[in-house]
């Protein structure tokens, strides 16, 4: 007993002694942090900060004895320059002029790099996935039915295009039938074929193949011809997003994170965030001619640095490394629009353009036929900010002799000013495919044209032109043109122009005032004076085009002549979804012509045949799966409503361009739903695409479920429709919400505690969505997989 008491007293004595060593004022404080980081090797996950720019991801950092080391690949990914070698981990001593600092409180690694050594940033438009151009399978028949009645002469004509399209290209043929109904036959009655061809586009290579009737490619200093044969060419229209000419780039360097603003000709066009280091700004707007850009960089402290960069841009150049070409081989076509099948000499024609660099584009052209060969070379060169120079020369060998053709031109454009000069000359014996076999062809021996225009601010703009041509028989024509236009009030415009043949009798002068009246149309008035007879004409015209979504339009015009007879015209038009019609009258008091026209198309697509307006290129057929009177939108503009079969055709779609097509479901009743309301689409040239926007009727109901004791089915229970597999959670008061219900449904309900029951639903025949059917009672627990449920009211 005494020993136990002694042990307790010893422990108490020791505890009191220890308590006396502790300062009560410091009893609740933590021990102080170590004054220095331990010398042991640590691997830390730190947020890297390069010249003040924090990276999103963390990287592993080794730290020992005050030195940090970073993996080579992490530095490279951040754009930090590293020396060559095989070392995986690099310390500060391995990185010249680069500092590494461990920020322990904020768990960061501060990396300081000379701005010029950082990886260059290329700031451009975000790369977007190129949309796949679509094409459905189908066919169409365009028509233009026209009839005219003048005095005792009447005739009718029908122009047509029959076209088929699909994944393998487009096939088309055009022609015209004409018949004299009364009066003397002019010899134009009968059928005349124009063009027949098959065309295929390769979107990956931007190449196009065409078989049949074609027009050969040409340069500014050569001429195209009609042929029947094969054509292989580059087609840049397949890529509307592609800029084929060189655009300027703007370089700079930022020491810290900030923003860069680009001002072009005084207008801010871009504002982008940048990281420290050198940068190249490539996201510039589409510009043309001479101009001035100002690049303004701003750091986090608001300091600004502005750099002015002059530039000159022309679309006549090709971007460096880009090629454009056209090769046509076949038989020359003669008497086009006069004979259906008239092909002659076999021939070949080709052009090729290549962007050697951003200032020079080379051009070549060649032609070959029986007894004719031609070759030419040229180039387009940008002269710094001074404009664009073009030069070309070509020579031909022909049975009747050899000849040369030369051309030279200059163009300068800037905001509010433009000037251009072009001169060409050709020998009398120079020949090409366009004149082959045409004995009476007369071509110009030389041609000179000069044009200039400038803006006058509030006074409008003025332009002038001089044209001088000399034919092979030494006939010379010189013409001077002057024009001035100015915007007046509320988008009205005044145009004044004058023309004079230097070897003629005087000036031909005209003035026109155009007054837009908004949705009510356009009113214009003009006066003309002719030097030949010294007479004048006054013209008054009113034009109200039919709305694009359909409707009525008309045009009225009256010409009063000081010498001669007055001229009158009137036209009435109707634009519908299925056809466009026009009727009109024109002429003077003694010679009047009545005419009428109907244009449209018949389209076979998607297992259906429908009527439409004339379709000149691509189109989209919208289908709502039989739901009528639903508004259809193209590029966010309502263009019509679906017909009784749920169709609306959009006949003026721009090919290869991604456009937004959609439907407006705001007017649908609550029991109607659409799977989607808009979708972007790109359609191949000459093709059509069927876009389905399924709109269907749904039976919507909120069903009330009760347990055997009259309490609602527990919150969080899961209800499943056995037929469709649709699931829905049970909410408060035993309510469960389902869409697309039929009159009879089999329902399985599983409570949170795992019990299940079957519910046989018999919904009311009426479709009143405001009612809540039920309650339906579940007997829990259910035996096996089936319980007993009865409707209690």
Predicted regions and their residues:
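Post-signal-peptide, soluble extracytosolic/periplasmic N-terminal scaffold domains
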Residues: 2-6, 14, 27-246, 531-603
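Short, ordered, surface-exposed loop/turn motifs in non-cytosolic proteins
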Residues: 39-46, 54-59, 626-636, 709-723
């Amino acid at each position: 007993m005494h020993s136990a008491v002694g042990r307790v007293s010893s422990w108490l004595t020791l505890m009191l002694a220890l308590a006396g060593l502790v300062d009560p004022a410091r009893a609740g404080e933590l021990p102080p942090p170590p004054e220095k980081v331990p010398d042991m090797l640590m691997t830390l996950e730190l947020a890297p900060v390069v010249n003040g720019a924090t990276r999103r991801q963390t990287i592993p950092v080794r730290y020992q004895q005050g030195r940090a080391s970073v993996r080579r690949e992490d530095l490279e990914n951040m754009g930090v320059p590293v020396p060559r070698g095989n070392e995986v981990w690099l310390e500060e001593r391995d990185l010249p002029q680069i500092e590494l600092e461990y920020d322990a409180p904020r768990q960061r690694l501060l990396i300081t790099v000379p701005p010029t050594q950082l990886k260059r940033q290329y700031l451009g438009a975000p790369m977007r996935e190129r949309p796949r151009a679509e094409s459905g399978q189908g066919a169409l028949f365009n028509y233009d039915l026209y009839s005219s009645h003048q005095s005792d002469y009447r005739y009718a004509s029908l122009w047509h295009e029959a076209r088929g399209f699909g994944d393998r290209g487009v096939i088309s043929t055009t022609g015209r039938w004409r018949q004299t109904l009364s009066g003397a036959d002019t010899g134009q009655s009968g059928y005349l074929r124009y063009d027949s061809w098959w065309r295929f586009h390769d979107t990956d290579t931007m190449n196009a193949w065409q078989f049949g009737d074609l027009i050969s490619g040409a340069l500014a200093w050569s001429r195209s011809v009609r042929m029947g044969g094969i054509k292989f060419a580059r087609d840049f229209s397949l890529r509307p997003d592609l800029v084929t000419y060189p655009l300027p780039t703007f370089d700079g360097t930022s020491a810290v994170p900030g923003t860069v603003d680009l001002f072009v000709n005084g207008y801010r066009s871009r504002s982008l965030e940048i990281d420290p280091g050198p940068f190249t700004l490539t996201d510039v707007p589409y510009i043309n001619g001479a101009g001035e850009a100002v690049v303004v960089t701003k750091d986090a402290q608001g300091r600004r640095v502005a750099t002015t960069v002059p530039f000159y841009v022309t679309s006549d150049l090709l971007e460096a490394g880009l090629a454009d070409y056209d090769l046509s081989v076949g038989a020359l076509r003669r008497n086009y629009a006069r004979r259906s099948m008239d092909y002659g000499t076999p021939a070949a024609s080709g052009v090729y353009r290549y962007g050697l660099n951003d200032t020079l584009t080379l051009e070549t052209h060649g032609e070959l036929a029986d007894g004719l060969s031609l070759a030419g070379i040229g180039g387009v060169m940008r002269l710094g900010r001074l404009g664009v120079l073009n030069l070309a020369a070509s020579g031909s060998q022909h049975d009747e002799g050899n000849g040369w053709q030369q051309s030279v031109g200059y163009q300068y454009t800037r905001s509010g000013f433009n000037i251009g000069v072009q001169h060409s000359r050709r020998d009398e014996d120079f020949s090409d495919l366009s004149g082959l076999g045409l004995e009476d062809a007369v071509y110009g021996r030389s041609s000179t044209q000069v044009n200039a225009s400038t803006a006058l601010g509030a006074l409008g703009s003025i332009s002038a032109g001089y044209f001088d041509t000399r034919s092979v028989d030494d006939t010379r024509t010189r013409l001077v043109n002057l024009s001035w236009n100015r915007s007046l009030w509320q988008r009205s415009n005044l145009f004044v122009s004058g023309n004079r043949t230097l070897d003629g009798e005087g000036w031909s002068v005209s003035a026109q005032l155009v007054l837009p009246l908004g949705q009510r149309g356009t009113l214009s008035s003009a006066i003309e004076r002719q030097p030949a007879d010294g007479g004048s004409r006054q013209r008054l015209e009113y034009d109200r085009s039919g709305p694009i979504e359909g409707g009525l339009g008309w045009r009225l015009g009256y010409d009063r002549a000081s010498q001669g007879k007055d001229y009158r015209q009137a036209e009435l038009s109707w634009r519908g979804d299925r056809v466009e019609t026009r009727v009109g009258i024109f002429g003077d008091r003694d010679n009047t012509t009545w005419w009428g026209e109907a244009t449209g198309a018949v389209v076979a697509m998607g297992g259906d045949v429908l009527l439409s307006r004339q379709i000149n290129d691509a189109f989209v057929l919208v289908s709502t799966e039989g739901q009528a009177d639903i508004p259809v939108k193209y590029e966010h503009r309502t263009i019509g409503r679906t017909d009784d079969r749920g169709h609306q055709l959009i006949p003026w779609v721009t090919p290869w361009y991604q456009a937004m097509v959609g439907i407006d479901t705001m007017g649908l009743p609550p029991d109607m739903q659409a799977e989607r309301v808009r979708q972007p689409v790109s359609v191949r040239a000459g093709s059509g695409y069927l876009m389905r926007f399924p709109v269907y009727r749904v039976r919507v109901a909120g069903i009330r479920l009760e347990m055997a004791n009259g309490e609602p089915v527990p919150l969080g229970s899961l209800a499943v429709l056995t037929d469709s597999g649709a699931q829905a959670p049970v909410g408060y008061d035993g309510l469960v919400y389902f869409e697309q219900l039929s009159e009879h449904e089999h329902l399985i309900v599983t409570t949170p505690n795992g019990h299940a029951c079957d519910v046989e639903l018999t919904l009311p025949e009426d479709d009143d969505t405001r009612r809540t059917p039920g309650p339906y009672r579940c007997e829990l627990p259910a035996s096996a997989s089936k319980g007993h449920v009865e409707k209690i009211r």
